[in-house]
């Protein structure tokens, strides 16, 4: 697998830097990943913000899943790969069902945080996948 090279202003080839990925993706796709990164951080901080740190399973799930969502979304900003959106879709679905699967559905703050953030992350990841698969083919 070779390194992508582009011609710089002088006409000489230059190596692709990590920000070329951000510049070449659509603004709305970058916005989706940025929103998902912020939502992941919000989920990771939710136990302290919403006061459910006493519920160990909910706290650890929010921290791990939130951090994973944020890291995957930030990774997609710098080097987009389709699998990153599939991972965030799966993490969003997991966050939706985690309160019942892990057993903290009776903790209102934890349940609502997981449901709302999981739903938004899942929908945005699915939207990003839809955009990738329905992008018009360039003829230029």
For every predicted segment, state its role.
Residues 77-85, 129-140:
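Cytoplasmic membrane-interface segments at the C-terminal ends of transmembrane helices
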Residues 54-67, 112-117:
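Structural signature of hydrophobic alpha-helical transmembrane segments
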Residues 32-34, 60, 86, 112:
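Tandem-repeat/low-complexity and Cys-motif detector
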Residues 1-34, 131-140:
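Intrinsic N-terminal pre-sequences and regulatory tails
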């Amino acid at each position: 697998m070779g390194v992508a090279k582009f011609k710089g202003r002088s006409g000489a080839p230059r190596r692709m830097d990590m920000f070329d990925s951000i510049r070449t993706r659509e603004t709305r796709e970058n916005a989706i990943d940025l929103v998902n990164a912020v939502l992941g951080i919000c989920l990771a901080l939710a136990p302290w913000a919403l006061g459910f740190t006493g519920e160990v399973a909910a706290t650890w799930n929010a921290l791990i899943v939130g951090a994973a969502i944020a890291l995957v979304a930030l990774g997609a900003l710098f080097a987009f790969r389709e699998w990153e959106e599939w991972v965030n879709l799966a993490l969003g679905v997991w966050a939706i069902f985690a309160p019942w699967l892990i057993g903290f559905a009776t903790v209102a703050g934890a349940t609502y945080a997981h449901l709302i953030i999981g739903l938004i992350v899942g929908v945005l990841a699915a939207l990003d996948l839809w955009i990738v698969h329905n992008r018009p083919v360039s003829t230029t």
